């Protein structure tokens, strides 16, 4: 089980595993060349720092915070999470890209809520060795926090 919390400007989480996934501190500099699977390249974005497994020079973030103070964590949601097929007319983001997708362009939870309105989190695996993780997400800034859950009946966004 994973737990995340935020209070004022503090954001944190734990990763309750008795073994390592090779996690490390990862820093994605401002304007890093993100290549999203189903979207155009992100040429201008915020810097991000967090914990990730870095594979093939790509940070698979567990949790992170951007330079504006917006934090996001992916937490276990096994048996409940359901990600979707690519949908025309939506911003289709693979689940493994969801954290950098939000943190690269949003400075606040308020901005994240607007971006989420047209976001479709896709069941696209990183590669054959990394299946889609069953997660839900907490997004927080110093003023508010939300939980994002992708389930069989759609994406739900809850004030937290």
Where does each model-flagged region fall?
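Surface-exposed patches in mature extracellular/periplasmic domains of secreted proteins
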Residues: 125-129
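An acidic- and aromatic-residue-enriched active-site/binding cleft used to recognize and process polar
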Residues: 14-16, 76-77, 117, 142, ...
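Alpha/propeptide regions of enzymes that mature by internal proteolysis
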Residues: 88-122
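Short, solvent-exposed loop/turn segments at the edges of secondary structure
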Residues: 65-67, 94, 132
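Residue-level signal for alpha-helical context at structural boundaries
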Residues: 29, 130-131
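Extended amphipathic alpha-helical segments with heptad-repeat/coiled-coil character used for oligomerization
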Residues: 131-160
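A contiguous strand-loop segment
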Residues: 1-90, 123
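Residue-level preference for alpha-helix termini and adjacent loops
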Residues: 14, 64, 102-105, 120, ...
């Amino acid at each position: 089980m994973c737990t995340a919390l935020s209070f004022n400007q503090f954001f944190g989480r734990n990763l309750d595993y008795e073994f390592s996934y090779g996690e490390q501190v990862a820093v994605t500099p401002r304007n890093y060349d993100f290549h999203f699977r189903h979207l155009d390249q992100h040429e201008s974005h915020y810097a991000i720092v967090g914990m990730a497994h870095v594979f093939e020079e790509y940070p698979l973030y567990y949790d992170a915070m951007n330079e504006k103070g917006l934090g996001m964590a992916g937490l276990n949601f096994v048996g409940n999470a359901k990600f979707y097929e690519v949908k025309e007319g939506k911003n289709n983001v693979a689940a493994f890209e969801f954290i950098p997708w939000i943190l690269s362009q949003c400075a606040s939870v308020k901005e994240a809520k607007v971006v989420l309105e047209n976001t479709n989190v896709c069941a696209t695996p990183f590669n054959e060795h990394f299946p889609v993780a069953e997660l839900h997400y907490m997004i927080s800034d110093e003023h508010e926090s939300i939980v994002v859950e992708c389930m069989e009946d759609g994406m739900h966004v809850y004030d937290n």
